């Protein structure tokens, strides 16, 4: 999976999840927040993509992992704790994943908190169109929990939140960077990020979810440990995820470096 993926999970949504996804991608407030998130993160801070493409990738991958877990007999938390349906959990995952980074439009610092309060009205207004009031409010709190806990250092307490956090970490291929690596300006972060060719999510043998990271250079191991590893650590679903890395074609990331 590179960043030119076809969003198979998003494109195959049906029923209420599809209607909500169609509404999300057309929502002017959501689109503006995502645009401003990239202006803040990429344009002003020199970070990687936190806009619409990132939102779609995280949503797609989170839904894929939720389905794998459900197939393996692991109930989503909203199903287990609130007597909801799998479709309800799918909606929670979709909304939480798509909106998790909109708080970057305010500031990168505590962006998970900014994302939660910016998402509140958006999520409530959407859910109240499809669900009775009490259920809409229940689902809203689950979405906000998932958004808030996607950041490292905050433990996810639901399956839905967990798959979103891990999915966030899977978007780490070299194509995510909107800032070309400056010649002779390399560090371990930029070299490692440039070494990630693609990420593949599939059913695992030892654990339900297997994430395979294909590298062009062993320097990418740093990115796996520092980005994806930290997301998994705090996701609350660590016991359900295994990660494998392999170098497909060893090639240099840089020719020379100046210290």
From Swiss-Prot:
Pfam families in UniProt: HD
CDD domains in the cross-refs: HDc
Transmembrane region(s): none
Highest taxon above the source species: Archaea
Disulfide bonds listed in the record: none
Residue ranges annotated for the HD domain, each copy included: 51-173
PANTHER family (UniProt xref): METAL-DEPENDENT PHOSPHOHYDROLASE, HD SUPERFAMILY-RELATED
Name of the molecule in the record: Uncharacterized protein MJ1020
Species the sequence originates in: Methanocaldococcus jannaschii (strain ATCC 43067 / DSM 2661 / JAL-1 / JCM 10045 / NBRC 100440) (Methanococcus jannaschii)
